[in-house]
A protein has these predicted regions:
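Active-site-adjacent loop/helix segments that line or gate small-molecule/cofactor pockets in enzymes
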Residues: 1-9
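Short, basic and Ser/Thr-rich N-terminal targeting/leader segments
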Residues: 8-11, 150
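Short, acidic, Ser/Thr-enriched surface-loop or helix-capping motifs
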Residues: 17-18
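Glycine-rich loop-to-alpha-helix module at the N-terminal edge of alpha/beta enzyme cores
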Residues: 22-104
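Short beta-strands and strand-loop turn motifs
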Residues: 24-27, 178-184
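Residue-level signal for inorganic ion chemistry
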Residues: 46, 154, 179
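PLP-dependent aspartate aminotransferase-fold enzymes
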Residues: 68-175
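Active-site core of PLP-dependent enzymes with the aminotransferase class I/II
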Residues: 161-168, 184-192
Length: 192
């Protein structure tokens, strides 16, 4: 078949493609569907909200209620900002960490996906032919158009090699604003 699989619909933990083949959906929309596809409670809540409006550029009362709930669960949260995507959340966090620390660089795990922001996608698709030295992974552009400045400001640490990662972080500690980590990085070969 010359084409990728196209989804027709999903139910629970399964997705059925346009040819009627049903599969377990291990991706779950990049882990955002923790309740599975078309969970009745979720469908009911979303349907009720759609009668009130589908999207707003303004804040809503539901955001305040949800923010207060999150704040009540973690005493260290001071403020919450809702955004439209994980990419936007990562962009805001990286900018905030740079502003707070006054440091220019970030560190991230080789192969981990954190969205489509130039800095977050560095070394997302690295391969053995561009890994660099074992103790010093290279910053690799995911595609043409990534500025050299983004590559220069991202320190890449290896996945599942704590001592090497700590050594690299220690080497760059004076320049690092933050370390971008995904505890379940599905794109680096982690199989839960």
């Amino acid at each position: 078949k010359p084409h990728p699989v196209y989804a027709a619909y999903g139910k629970g933990c399964q997705v059925t493609d346009i040819e009627g083949v049903r599969r377990i959906d291990f991706s779950n929309n990049m882990a955002s569907l923790i309740h599975g596809h078309a969970h009745p409670t979720v469908v009911e809540a979303v349907s009720a909200q759609l009668t009130k409006g589908s999207a707003f550029a303004l804040a809503t009362e539901q955001e305040v209620v949800y923010a207060e709930h999150l704040l009540s669960r973690n005493p260290h949260f001071e403020k919450i900002r809702f955004v439209n995507s994980g990419t936007e959340a990562v962009m805001a966090c990286l900018k905030a960490s740079r502003a707070y620390t006054g440091r220019p660089k970030i560190a991230k795990v080789e192969g981990a996906y954190h969205g489509l922001y130039d800095y977050a996608e560095v070394s997302q698709t690295s391969t053995p032919d561009n890994w660099g030295e074992p103790g010093h992974p290279r910053s690799v552009a995911v595609s043409h158009g990534t500025p050299q400045a983004a590559l220069d400001d991202v320190i890449v640490i290896p996945f599942n090699d704590v001592s090497t990662a700590l050594g690299i972080l220690d080497e760059h500690k004076r320049d690092l604003a933050c370390v971008l980590i995904d505890p379940m990085p599905h794109r680096v070969g982690l199989v839960p």
